Amino acid sequence: MIISTTDKIPGYKIKEITGIVMGNIVHSKHLGKDIAAAFKTLAGGEIKSYTEMMTEARNKAIERMIDEAEKLGADAIVSVRFSSSAIMSGAAEILVYGTAVKLLPKDI
């Protein structure tokens, strides 16, 4: 599955748009790690547990979007965008969405 933030894939032309696809997840941290992160904010610097949480959540949201595209028979997802929002303290929603398409090589 080709995934791109652009609306075109080099070397291919879009044969068919199969639909809008998305994946989302609301992810939270373990209470103990949340408390440790609160202390880290006092000292400043990166809060690695939250960075890891957001990376994990983003990857899971992408997997879910790909699953939707595969169900539609798509070869690629173009115009991919990400959105995140805080749901509550220590929990965030990640939404990823794009347009699922079928491709043809440009020389055909």
Swiss-Prot record:
Pfam families: YbjQ_1. It comes from the Bacteria. Gene3D superfamilies: Hypothetical protein apc22750. Chain B (3.30.110.70). Belongs to the UPF0145 family. HAMAP family: UPF0145. This is UPF0145 protein Tmel_1129. It comes from Thermosipho melanesiensis (strain DSM 12029 / CIP 104789 / BI429).
